[in-house]
Amino acid sequence: MTDKTSLSYKDAGVDIDAGNALVERIKGVSKRTRRPEVLGGLGGFGALCQIPAGYKEPVLVSGTDGVGTKLRLAIDLKKHDTVGIDLVAMCVNDLIVQGAEPLFFLDYYATGKLDVDTAAAVVTGIGVGCEQSGCALVGGETAEMPGMYEGEDYDIAGFCVGVVEKSEIIDGSKVGDGDALIALAASGPHSNGFSLVRKILEVSKADVHQPLGDTTLASALLEPTRIYVKPVLKLIKECEIHALSHITGGGFWENIPRVLPANTQAVIDEQSWQWPAVFSWLQQAGNVTRHEMYRTFNCGVGMIIALPADQLEKALTLLKAEGENAWHIGHIAKAVDGEEQVIIQ
């Protein structure tokens, strides 16, 4: 290098102009998700949001998550427009477990080389997820980091804040013997278990474009995570909800006990639903044990709700009216020390 050589940030692999072009592309996305509590627009150093009116003792609830290695499959198949929905879903579905209404969302998009079209597709999906959950997309970070990611590979993370009345926090403490359990159907594997999914695809040498029911294997795997916010918030207003469990990483065995008091167990009726075809395919193609399936995947159940048995029919009617595929999946029973907290029979 001579003394006359002048290097720029772009020479180092960071294109500020591309970043600015992306911001212009996504301004409309943010605007469509706006809530009245949000002050200001995109571009500030921080995003401002008021607590909604009507809360006496508001408690903020926060959560952060990613999409895991589902992204690898999406990138390989050049399907970028739905992983943003997955990202929002993984965060907001966790918030409603405590009974919280999501308020605002921020995203982090990191890549080795920024492709504006790809990033815009991802953020547009984030906007769709925010609209589905009534959550404002108030900002984010786009990081172009040459040398950190291979080519145009990218990773995304989300952060969400919601609010709940202190006296209405759902923490599982009211769960008791005889409570009914309701399942809300999942749209597919959602955003968990994809390292195993990809291993099964590798070992079985399966064609991801093969037919699977009325769709393809690829489409079934990449179907965006269902967002349960609006129907569940409506249910919380109409029924006495004792607990909610978002069936994510760890499946049934890990997630249901997170909301159960000691000396209680969830008894799941395996005959109450049929696994969607994608899970049967995964089990067969990977020779995966039943226990491992329930530990890794949601097996068609995205959320489980515990409530008094006398409110079961009312809740099912409401959920179905809201467009959810909901069914009676089991009940809560007493358990003695040392007993499993989840029984699937």
Curated annotation (Swiss-Prot):
Disulfide bonding pattern of the chain: none
A single GO BP annotation from the record? 'de novo' IMP biosynthetic process
| InterPro entries xrefs | PurM-like_C_dom (IPR010918), PurM-like_C_sf (IPR036676), PurM-like_N (IPR016188), PurM-like_N_sf (IPR036921), PurM_cligase (IPR004733)
Reactions performed catalytically: 2-formamido-N(1)-(5-O-phospho-beta-D-ribosyl)acetamidine + ATP = 5-amino-1-(5-phospho-beta-D-ribosyl)imidazole + ADP + phosphate + H(+)
Which SUPFAM superfamilies does the record match to this protein? Answer: PurM C-terminal domain-like, PurM N-terminal domain-like
The answer, when asked if Cytoplasm is one of the entry's keywords, is yes
Q: Which PANTHER family match?
A: TRIFUNCTIONAL PURINE BIOSYNTHETIC PROTEIN ADENOSINE-3, TRIFUNCTIONAL PURINE BIOSYNTHETIC PROTEIN ADENOSINE-3-RELATED
Q: What is this protein called?
A: Phosphoribosylformylglycinamidine cyclo-ligase
Q: Which organism is it from?
A: Aeromonas salmonicida (strain A449)
What's the name of its gene? purM
